[in-house]
């Protein structure tokens, strides 16, 4: 960028940051310093808050699409949980403690469901905090994928699906003694940037409508950052009698979702990206009310009737009879009836600490409002780079704001990625790479600033210059 362009971008960023009505929540997070990310030693103690004058010492962290940063209150909440365990032992399951903000362990998952429901646009009864993403996808498919080789047996997914989704589909098909050659349909993109148009999705559905049992798609595509038209695709699939599951790993906490109103059948997500739950933290699933009702009183004589069959565990059993130990499964109505084992309270406590901040920030609509501005500003600032630098990358994420979340994916010219990533890290910038040529940059509205976007573009410009010289 030219000196004038840099100065202008910094002035714009300062003005936008001053206007940011949710800027206060940035202080709720531990953003690593440049010194910390450069160090190979474990810090002696938990990172302390930096004085405002030292904000420049923080790294430029634009990697919330891979792993969100740590909320400061996570340590407080985890210590409260550990203190409960240390001082109460097994009583922590049932005994509420005065002056503790934490629910009893028996109720921890239900409280977390209350916190996550507005994030995904669901009734509380339609969500469960449980397991991990791929495990939940398997659980949903085990309940709702009932193939008939003489009728509906196919599963449709995108050809560039995240590998774990692909593996789940393949193994579910084989589990039913079917072949992927006959029962798996891949949606191919005609775009050089792997963008899947809604028309392409609908065309594939139409072509296989009578033989398709299930559709599995990402709410936001992990590689390109494309936001798919969830309500339109869901409605079209339903017209053809197809059950729809959405993988919301990159959508939850990123864009507003209205799963109940959209009539989504089921969905699953992780919690360590935009939800900031921590590495490998507990996942979640959504099952629409229409698919999770207990239609009549379950009797001991016919315990398999009255609800949709699923792989079951005792934590999905009605709380009234859960501890009777009668070995007769009476599921909770709603998504909670799909739970298996008692969940990790450590995980739920960590996730809930972050979800508290979502509430304080005003919910997903407020975050989306800022996110739209952040990502558009980042895109515009990249457009002000020198022409000779812009010739070495292109943005493959859709340019329309309604077709993307926070992430911009930058496709670099061949041979530049490794050097660019090394140079960015040396300049205190953390982003995500996807071989062979893509950098994924995701300003998260909870803790990123417009200034972060400018500083990234400055560092990216310098990194490109070095990479081009190395490539000669």
Swiss-Prot record:
Its Enzyme Commission number(s) read 3.7.1.3
Q: Where found in the cell?
A: Cytoplasm
Q: Which residues form a coiled coil?
A: none
Cofactor(s) annotated in UniProt: pyridoxal 5'-phosphate
Q: What class of enzyme is it?
A: hydrolase
GO cellular-component terms in the record?
Answer: cytoplasm
Concerning PANTHER family, the annotation shows: KYNURENINASE (PTHR14084:SF0)
Q: Which NCBIfam families match?
A: kynureninase
Protein's name according to its UniProt entry: Kynureninase 2
Q: Which organism is it from?
A: Neurospora crassa (strain ATCC 24698 / 74-OR23-1A / CBS 708.71 / DSM 1257 / FGSC 987)
Source species taxonomy: Eukaryota, Fungi, Dikarya, Ascomycota, Pezizomycotina
């Amino acid at each position: 960028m030219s000196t004038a362009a840099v100065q202008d971008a910094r002035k714009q960023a300062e003005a936008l940051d001053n206007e940011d009505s949710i800027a206060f929540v940035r202080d709720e997070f531990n953003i690593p310093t440049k010194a910390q990310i450069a160090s190979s030693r474990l810090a002696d103690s938990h990172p302390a808050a930096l004085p405002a004058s030292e904000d420049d010492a923080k790294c430029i962290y634009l990697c919330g699409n891979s792993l969100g940063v740590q909320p400061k209150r996570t340590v407080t909440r985890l210590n409260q949980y550990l203190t409960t365990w240390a001082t109460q032992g097994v009583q922590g399951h049932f005994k509420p403690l005065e002056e503790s903000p934490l629910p009893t362990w028996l109720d921890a998952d239900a409280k977390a469901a209350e916190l996550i429901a507005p994030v995904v646009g669901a009734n509380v009864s339609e969500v469960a905090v449980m397991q991990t993403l791929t495990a939940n996808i398997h659980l949903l498919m085990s309940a709702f994928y009932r193939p008939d080789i003489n009728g509906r047996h196919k599963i449709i997914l995108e050809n560039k699906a995240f590998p774990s989704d692909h593996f789940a589909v393949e193994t579910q098909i084989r589990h039913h003694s079917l072949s992927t050659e006959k029962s798996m349909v891949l949606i191919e993109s005609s775009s050089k940037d792997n963008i899947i148009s809604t028309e392409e999705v609908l065309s594939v559905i139409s072509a296989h409508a009578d033989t398709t049992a299930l559709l599995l798609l990402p709410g936001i595509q992990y590689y390109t950052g494309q936001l798919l038209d969830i309500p339109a695709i869901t409605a079209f699939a339903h017209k053809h009698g197809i059950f729809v599951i959405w993988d919301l790993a990159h959508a939850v906490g990123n864009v507003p979702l209205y799963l109940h109103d959209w009539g989504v059948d089921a969905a699953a997500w992780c919690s360590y990206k935009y939800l900031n739950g921590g590495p490998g933290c507990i996942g979640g699933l959504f099952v629409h009310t229409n698919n999770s009702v207990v239609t009549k009183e379950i009797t001991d004589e016919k315990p398999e009737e009255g609800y949709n069959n699923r792989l079951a565990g005792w934590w999905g059993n009605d709380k009234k009879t859960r501890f009777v130990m009668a070995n007769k499964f009476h599921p909770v109505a709603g998504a909670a009836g799909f739970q298996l084992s008692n969940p990790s309270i450590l995980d739920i406590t960590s996730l809930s600490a972050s979800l508290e901040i979502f509430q304080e920030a005003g919910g997903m609509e407020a975050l989306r409002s800022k996110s739209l501005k952040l990502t558009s500003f980042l895109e515009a600032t990249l457009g002000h780079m020198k022409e000779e630098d812009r010739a070495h990358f292109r943005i493959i994420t859709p340019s329309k704001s309604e077709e993307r979340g926070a992430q911009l994916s930058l496709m670099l010219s061949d041979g530049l990625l490794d050097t660019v990533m090394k140079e960015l890290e040396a300049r205190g910038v953390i982003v995500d790479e996807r071989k062979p040529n893509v950098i994924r940059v995701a300003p998260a509205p909870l803790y990123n600033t417009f200034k972060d976007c400018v500083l990234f573009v400055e560092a990216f410009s310098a990194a490109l210059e070095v990479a081009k010289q190395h490539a000669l």
